[in-house]
């Protein structure tokens, strides 16, 4: 995996995924039926939301994951806490840790590693090729639109995506520019700062909008 550890598996039938992009990739490879558990960030495709949830990927519990009887756990290096990852590994259940980096190259490498783990290398190559083809089709604007992504979780908490986030990467891939570039990660932002960023578009997730 991305940590240099060797992960040995044999035709896994019960997979737990601990990242939205990992979940989406497994579904795209045609193996969604083999997923028995997902983390709270796994909102796409819609079928993923019907799987057993094991909590937010940064705060999962070994007991919740192992109770599903998985024969493979696929996570990113952002999953945790670390002692839980070690508990899963010590239980004998294979766990593959992939990079959570957000560049295009990192996303392609992640897809290829997941495809190799699941013996779907041909399908993985097709996914990567399709990604590259779609990127070439993105319309290039002389003045790319400024896009603001708000991750709302209710209770008045509105975190805005800065650089080095999956939202920032997706905005770039779609031909836009992030309206917020003066910090990395997600941070709260008040109404005045939101207006000052002068976005052309503001994005929410469906669930985030409902929580406001």
Locate each region found by the language model.
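Bacterial Sec-exported substrate-binding components of ABC uptake systems
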Residues: 1-23, 120-150, 198-201
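A short, structured surface patch at a secondary-structure boundary
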Residues: 14-79
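Alpha-helical, coiled-coil/dimerization segments enriched in small aliphatic residues
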Residues: 39-44, 159-186
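Short acidic active-site motifs
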Residues: 60-64, 83-84, 136, 189-193
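Alpha-to-beta junction loops
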Residues: 68-73, 94, 176, 197-202
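Short beta->alpha connector loops at strand-helix junctions that form conserved
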Residues: 76-77, 97-100, 182
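A ligand-binding cleft/hinge motif common to bilobed small-molecule-binding domains
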Residues: 79-90, 201-212
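Extracytoplasmic ligand-binding site segments that recognize negatively charged/polar headgroups
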Residues: 83, 96-113, 144-166
């Amino acid at each position: 995996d991305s940590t240099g550890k060797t992960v040995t598996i044999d035709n896994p039938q019960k997979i737990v995924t601990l990242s939205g992009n990992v979940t989406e990739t497994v579904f795209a490879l045609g193996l969604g039926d083999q997923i028995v558990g997902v983390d709270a960030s796994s909102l796409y495709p819609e079928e993923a939301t019907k799987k057993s949830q094991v909590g937010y990927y940064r705060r999962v519990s070994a007991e919740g994951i192992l109770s599903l009887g998985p024969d493979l756990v696929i996570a990113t290096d952002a999953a945790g806490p670390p002692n839980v990852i070690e508990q899963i590994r010590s239980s004998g259940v294979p766990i593959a840790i992939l990079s959570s980096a957000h560049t295009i190259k990192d996303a392609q490498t992640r897809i290829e590693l997941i495809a190799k783990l699941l013996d779907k290398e041909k399908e993985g190559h097709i996914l990567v090729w399709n990604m590259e083809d779609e990127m070439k089709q993105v319309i290039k604007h002389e003045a790319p639109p400024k896009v603001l992504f708000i991750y709302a979780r209710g209770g008045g908490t509105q975190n805005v995506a800065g650089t080095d986030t999956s939202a920032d990467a997706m905005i770039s891939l779609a031909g836009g520019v992030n309206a917020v570039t003066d910090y990395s990660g997600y941070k709260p932002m008040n109404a005045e700062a939101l207006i000052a960023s002068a976005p052309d578009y503001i994005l929410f997730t469906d669930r985030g909008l409902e929580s406001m």
